[in-house]
């Protein structure tokens, strides 16, 4: 295209035609139907002509860019601006978006709409004048989050965190893993605990020693500089999220469906999220459900089963707040400050939140890694200091030396034990929200296997810590594991008994056999042991037969048992004797039911098997109801109630001779500080004395 002096003042007709570089065109006859119509584009007086670095225009377009003789990248002088040329006809419009530099991954793009005669620059794209290739300025991403190279990440760690070159070189694989699997993306968020779980899996698969959650946060910020965090979720159940990063589409982690499902929830725009609900469709997992099921990998099969199991747990559970440590008038240990105690509070709370997230996703195998990472935390700097960042999302790190000192401090031991009671009670309510609701046997078995491994995992993770704190924490974990075993057994019994209670012929046979039992003889034998009110026993007998005759469902039987507990324990409400009365009721209930089963056995009752199953279920459910009533009366969690008495039982000489037991009782009665206190408080004082002697 040639420009003439006269062509600048008038409209110019331009014909599009093909040409060769060195030969004259060869003209051949072409049929009329195939002839190319000459296309003319007429540009009005607003067309700009650009030569070199100077832009000339005959329209009244205001200057939007500052000019410098040096080669540079021009940026908009302000936010979004629109400049229209004067005059009618075609229009040239330049759209400038708010960012002030060129993204390193973007090309400068201009799109032309010939029909509309508009030139519009795409969002985030900029017109660059001058020689960019020879410029000493490099494009930079002005978004608050942008990825760094491996060298830049190591340099940031050395500069900002004081990590030596040798230590930073050991983190190369960790940093490279972040670069390979995550990328920046606006409008999405990722929970910190979820990203840390991915990291723990990576370390487990590649036999690497993981860093704790706080140090891992520093690694992330060294790779994704300017990373922001937000606290998302409902009040009392909010969690910190990294805002502006997501899993790469081609990341190997996408092949693991349970992670992809969890990430799909988090990687939606914030206003579209639904907390902890598994996604119905996962990108990259296959479009055809039939083909996906036929060619599913073992990981996908396990993930699909995990997704199915999540409907049976309570993923909306609100994690209660932890109490503050009660230091009383005790002096702090040497070298420990209040800042260290506050850091421990924050660090332990986030550790427990990560545990909750892992259990909610049924990833039980990561609990061991979480415990190992927490109880083997390393100093944040060579001198062991732990400066807190100005950002509220910065994870504090307590060196192992200080953590061991704090674990010997009595108020911290009590505080950590109380926090564990809250944590494990929340986990029980998440995994088994309803002990009578039908649950798949695979989920029940997974929970029982999880309970079986807990004590060993914690003992191994805390092998270097003082025995006082290890014993205290293992005691709570043992109560947690025992509760899971009891509740899963109760659930299994409930499903077996449900079939019996729905069978009319079996119910009729049970009622017939029960009417043959000599309850007067049962009461006569049991009265000497239990000393129960005869009227109460007769009323329970009549109510039991009536409920059985009505062919009540399992839920109706559960309501009846609950009413029995309420009726029996009502006289003791508000009294310090409530826990003791509740335990005595369990013993008496079990003794009476065993006497009835004995009579049915001697009579060779046809429904003996059904009665035996029902008896096991009702005894276990009574235990469940009573422990919750005692917890409610004492203001504790059921885990705390069971843990307290299980610890007391483990410290009590159960297998001792009678003389030793009586000697222990006489010692207790002789203590003036204990003998004058109520039974419940007396037991707690005895427990505290035993704890201090350990």
From Swiss-Prot:
Ranges of Polar residues compositional bias? 289-299
Region listing for Disordered, in residue ranges: 267-310, 658-694
Gene Ontology cellular component? cytoplasm; nucleus
Keywords associated with the record: Cilium biogenesis/degradation, Cytoplasm, DNA-binding, Nucleus, Transcription, Transcription regulation
Q: Domain of life here?
A: Eukaryota
The coiled-coil segments of this chain are none
One Pfam family recorded for the sequence? RFX1_trans_act
Localization per record = Nucleus; Cytoplasm
- Keyword hit for Transcription regulation: yes
Give the matching InterPro entries: DNA-bd_RFX, RFX-like, RFX1_trans_act, WH-like_DNA-bd_sf, WH_DNA-bd_sf
Name the Gene3D superfamilies on file: Winged helix-like DNA-binding domain superfamily/Winged helix DNA-binding domain
Regions of compositional bias (Low complexity) in chain numbering: 300-310
One GO term of the biological process aspect: neural tube closure
Q: What SUPFAM superfamilies is this protein classified in? A: Winged helix' DNA-binding domain (SSF46785)
Q: Does the keyword Nucleus apply?
A: yes
Complexes and interactors = Homodimer. Heterodimer; heterodimerizes with other rfx proteins.
* Family label: Belongs to the RFX family.
Free-text function comment from the UniProt entry: Transcription factor that acts as a key regulator of ciliogenesis. Specifically regulates expression of genes required for cilium assembly and function. Recognizes and binds the X-box, a regulatory motif with DNA sequence 5'-GTNRCC(0-3N)RGYAAC-3' present on promoters. Required for neural tube closure and neural ciliogenesis.
Protein name in UniProt? DNA-binding protein RFX2
Gene designation: rfx2
């Amino acid at each position: 295209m040639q420009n003439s002096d006269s062509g600048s003042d008038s409209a110019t007709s331009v014909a599009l035609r093909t040409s060769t570089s060195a030969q004259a065109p060869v003209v051949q006859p072409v049929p009329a139907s195939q002839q190319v119509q000459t296309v003319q584009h007429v540009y009005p007086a607003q067309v700009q002509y650009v030569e070199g670095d100077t832009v000339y225009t005959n329209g009244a377009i205001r200057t939007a860019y500052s000019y410098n003789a040096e080669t540079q990248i021009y940026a908009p002088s302000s936010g979004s601006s629109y400049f229209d040329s004067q005059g009618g006809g075609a229009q040239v419009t330049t759209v400038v978006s708010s960012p002030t530099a060129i993204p390193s991954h973007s090309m400068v793009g201009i799109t032309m709409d010939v029909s509309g005669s508009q030139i519009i620059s795409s969002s985030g794209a900029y017109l660059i004048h001058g020689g960019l290739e020879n410029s000493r300025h490099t494009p930079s991403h002005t978004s608050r989050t942008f990825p760094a190279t491996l060298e830049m990440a190591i340099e940031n760690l050395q500069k900002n965190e004081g990590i030596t070159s040798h230590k930073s070189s050991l983190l190369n694989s960790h940093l490279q893993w972040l670069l390979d699997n995550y990328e920046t993306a606006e409008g999405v968020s990722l929970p910190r605990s979820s990203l840390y779980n991915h990291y723990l899996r990576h370390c487990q698969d590649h036999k690497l020693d993981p860093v704790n959650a706080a140090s891992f946060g520093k690694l992330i910020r060294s790779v994704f500089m300017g990373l922001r965090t937000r606290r998302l979720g409902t009040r009392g159940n909010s969690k910190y999220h990294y805002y502006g990063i997501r899993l790469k589409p081609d990341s190997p982690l996408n092949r693991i469906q349970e992670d992809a499902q969890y990430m799909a929830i988090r990687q939606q725009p914030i206003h579209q999220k639904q907390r902890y609900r598994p996604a119905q469709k996962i990108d990259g997992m296959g479009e055809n459900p039939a083909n996906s099921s036929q060619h599913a990998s073992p990981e996908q099969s396990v993930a699909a089963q995990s997704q199915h199991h999540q409907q049976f747990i309570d993923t909306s559970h609100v994690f209660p707040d932890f109490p503050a440590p009660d230091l009383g008038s005790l002096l702090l240990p040497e070298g420990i400050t209040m800042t260290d105690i506050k850091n421990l509070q924050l660090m332990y709370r986030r550790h427990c939140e990560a545990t909750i997230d892992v259990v909610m996703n049924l990833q039980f195998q990561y609990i061991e890694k979480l415990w190992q990472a927490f109880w083997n935390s390393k100093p944040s700097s060579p001198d062991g200091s732990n400066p807190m960042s100005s950002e509220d999302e910065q994870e504090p790190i307590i060196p192992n030396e200080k953590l061991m000192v704090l674990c010997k401090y009595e108020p911290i031991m009590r505080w950590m034990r109380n926090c564990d009671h809250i944590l494990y009670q929340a986990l029980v309510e998440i995994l088994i929200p309803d002990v009578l609701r039908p649950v798949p046997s695979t989920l029940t078995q997974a929970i029982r296997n999880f309970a079986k491994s807990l004590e060993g995992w914690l003992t191994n993770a805390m092998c270097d810590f003082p025995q006082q704190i290890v014993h205290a924490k293992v005691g709570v974990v043992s109560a947690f594991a025992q509760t899971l075993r009891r509740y899963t057994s109760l659930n299994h019994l409930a499903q077996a008994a449900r079939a019996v209670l729905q069978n009319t012929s079996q119910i009729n046979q049970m009622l017939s056999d029960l009417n043959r039992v000599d309850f007067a003889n049962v009461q006569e034998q049991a009265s000497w042991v239990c000393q129960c009110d005869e009227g109460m026993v007769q009323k329970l007998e009549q109510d039991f037969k009536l409920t059985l005759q009505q062919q009540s469902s399992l839920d109706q039987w559960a309501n009846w048992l609950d009413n029995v507990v309420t009726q029996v324990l009502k006289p003791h409400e508000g009294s310090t004797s409530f826990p003791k009365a509740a335990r005595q009721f369990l013993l008496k209930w079990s003794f009476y039911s065993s006497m009835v089963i004995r009579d049915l056995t001697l009579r060779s009752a046809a429904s003996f098997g059904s009665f035996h199953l029902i008896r096991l279920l009702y005894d276990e459910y009574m235990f469940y109801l009573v422990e919750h009533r005692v917890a409610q009366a004492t203001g504790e969690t059921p885990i705390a109630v069971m843990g307290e008495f299980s610890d007391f039982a483990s410290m009590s000489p159960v297998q001792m001779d009678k003389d030793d037991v009586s000697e222990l009782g006489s010692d207790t009665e002789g203590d003036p500080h204990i003998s004058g206190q109520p039974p419940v408080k007396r037991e707690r004082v005895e427990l505290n004395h035993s704890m201090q002697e350990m």
